[in-house]
Amino acid sequence: MKRFPALTLLLALLLVAAPLQNIESAEASNPPRKILTGWLPYYSMKTYLPAVLSNADLIKEIMPFWYTLKFDGKTKKPVIADVYKTANPSVPITEPLTALRNAGMTIIPTITDGTEKLVLANLLAKPVSRKQVVDAIVATVASQNYDGIDLDFEGFAFIDPNTTWKTTAPNWVLFVKELGAALHAQKKILSITTPYLFNPAEKQKGYFVYAWADIAPHIDRLRIMTYDYSTSRPGPIGPIAWTEKTVKYAVSIMPASKVYLGLPGYGKDWVTKVEGVCPANLAKIITPSAKAGTFLMRDAASIAATYGAVPTYNETFAEVTFSYKREYTGTTSSGLSTTCTASRTAWHQNAQSFSVRAQLVAKYQLGGAAQWVIGQEEPLAMVAIREVATSIAPAQLESSLSLSTNQISYGNPVTLSGAITLKDKSPVASLAFSVEGKYPDGTTRILTTGTTSFDGTYSIPMLIGKSVSLRVLTEASWERGASESPALSLVVTRNLILNPPTSVKSGVPFAISGVVLPRAAGVTITLATTTGRVIGTATATDAQGAFTINVPAQARSIATYQITVGADATWPVFASDAFSIIIR
């Protein structure tokens, strides 16, 4: 297939460009808050992938819309189907993923519900099949080392009867709890995308099958589909008051940082009246009873201009509407020429609409906004989001780190010191920070935590048991961005506690004892002169790391020795400092 002949070349260029953009953003004095997330579909990748990458300064997470849940009738098990591969056979999935990762984005692909009516609800009702769904999702995350998963299971809302919701809801909650535990054990993110809910105590509850309050402790993101408000009749896509109402409910039951409001990159276009007889091939869709058509926001102005319509911004709904007439010419079912004129009404959001909704992110300190689909918007819409994001940009921090020494022997302390300031060098007092250690095998862990003093400085003595790369981290808050210091390497060597005699008689054997730290059995201990001549026989440590070397009788002299501790799977060879014994 040659569906995307230029996509591979485009990706190659973007792989180079994305890191440059990150550098420019890092150097900006006030980079915008990354409040935008959104979906990247499996289709039209040549259009939508560049749109995502060109706005990397705004986008912290991207949800590739690449997977769907199916039920395999032969194996009687759920499976996750990869729709990206089918649509893009000539472009390996690793290519767009590399471009997104180079742009610094968290990648949380979406899985949709591609099963038939009540199939998923029945799968979640049984512990065995519910676990099969969990396992299939976890395996999908592992397949490309994704940062997590986003679930867009709309079948409950729009395919299953609402009479089943009370039965489905508790099984859904169990599923989310089990999936969340499985993902969090691997430090992965669980994102849930659902239609709106309102307070269940109110008359209008929304899609309560998704049980936000019950799943809140187990999820990391809630992306609300604050669009498709109007369906059968002309009206706004997602009126601002309705959007704010569901957002207010969400933040009342979970941390606001988990909540993302939806932004539609599309509009809808309804037929309100038809005059004349429409062509036979259009008769079922050019009628007031037909489903509304859709169009991309970026095409709205040209549609209005083509038909002489004058768009009007509705302040109440914070959306744009326009009406127009369009003629359709063709033939009837009997082959006669015919023309009909349809009156149509369109609604869509624009740059001003996006700005108003981005301001809700600021008002409620939300995690951000989620756009369907990034790249469908008019150019000024992204400008509007960027303006709001810049106005609420978190303060940028700088962290420094120094070590009292870059090498210590086991059991001795090292002092970490430094300062955390704003970019203008103003100190940040009473700020919590953590010290992260990264080990040679690639594993990391938090070694200790602390708080800056009144002048933004810190000083922490630490006992560290093995060689490690250290850095100081601060977490992001609404007021401040996350920060990390440069990483510094600390080498930790074995320690050797020696008990040599200060003097011995010549011609008489003597012993030298000691302890190797950290304590370990079977470590080879060798005594030699500083010229390298081995004295006596090598020995090994006992279970407490202790050893004794029996030294043969020596002639009268001032002897200088050195003990070598052999290597093992964890520690390299280590030699003690030279020491002298008077042989009288």
Residue ranges and their predicted role:
Residues K284, S391-D424, S489-R519:
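Beta-strand-rich domain onsets/edges
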Residues K74-V91, A157-I303:
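Substrate-binding surface in catalytic domains of secreted glycosidases
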Residues L422-R445, P518-V534:
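Short flexible loop/turn segments that cap and initiate beta-strands
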Residues S29-A139:
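Glycan-recognition patch characteristic of GH18 chitinases/ENGases
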Residues G456-I460, G545-I549:
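Short strand-edge motifs at loop-to-beta-strand transitions and within beta-strands
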Residues G265-Q359, V388-I392:
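Glycan-binding loop/region signatures in secreted carbohydrate-active enzymes
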Residues I464-S485, S557-A575:
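Enriched for extracellular/lumenal, surface-exposed ectodomains of secreted and cell-surface proteins
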Residues I62, L151, L222, L261, ...:
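Conserved, mostly hydrophobic/aromatic
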